[in-house]
Amino acid sequence: MGGTGVIDHFLEVFTRYIDGGFGLLSGEVTFIATTLIVIDVVLAALFWSWGADDDVIARLVKKTLFVGVFAYLIGNWNNLARIVFESYAGLGLKASGTSFSVADLLRPGKVAQTGLDAGRPLLESISDLMGWVSVFENFIQIACLLFAWALILLAFFILAVQLFVTLIEFKLTTLAGFVLIPFGLFGKSAFMAERVLGNVISSGIKVLVLAVIIGIGSTLFSEFTAGFGGATPTIDDAMAIVLAALSLLGLGIFGPGIANGLVSGGPQLGAGAAIGTGLAAGGMVMALSLIHISEPTRQAE
């Protein structure tokens, strides 16, 4: 549970309790489904008995198939939701061409660890520039490299948190949908089940988008840091990494909104997203600076 694995432990605990909720709620869901089936079939039988010219056999077959489909959905809801998740996650990872697997995507701590690994060459370069005299001679370069390292960590940590929230959202959506799916058996309450299915698909698209962003981002930053070839990166190299980290940070913050745009039919990313990313990054860096300034003051007191 140490290091970046703490977020994996949180996800494991949440997942275990949410998956246990399906077993705890199965009795109530079965009761709701049975009640709605009885109401629907009784009403249908009354209407069929009044309509002498209707084809009762055809209507009975249609009603049986309809009830059977919903019974299958209710009985296998958790497994079907898992298949949807793995399908969308697999598509996103395949599109990005990364070495990440679906199992790795279920570990947000691995995403955070990827950021630590991507920023480690910068820290090693900073340590090579440190010295009693060289620290003052290379102060600007050290500051730029440290700033680039902080932004890389920030970008990947935000991606890890976004992935954690998305996974929990998907689990909670499927659990809440498990309770609402039986209402699709009755015509007057069918809209509740329709929204559940739409929400599950929307959450799956969000997983796909995050999988693409994480896969491409991890590949790009491994190429960035490997491109130094053991040499100390210059200020231009550091600023290039800052630009890349800001781009990944913007995608991590606003990228999941693409899923909402696909469902609603409107674009979600634009200049406002870029400005918001810059302001968010600036605010976080300023907060870190204030913390570093306040620490010597507290020690002096």
What spans do the regions from the language model cover?
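Hydrophobic alpha-helical transmembrane segments
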Residues: 3-16, 82-99, 145-156, 181-199
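Membrane-water interface regions at transmembrane-helix termini and the short interhelical loops
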Residues: 44-57, 157-160, 164, 187-194
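Cytosolic juxtamembrane regulatory segments of multi-pass membrane proteins
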Residues: 275-290
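Single conserved hydrophobic/aromatic residue that forms the stacking wall/gate
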Residues: 291-301
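Juxtamembrane interface at the ends
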Residues: 169-191, 260
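Binding/recognition "hotspot" determinant
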Residues: 1-38, 42, 46, 52-55, ...
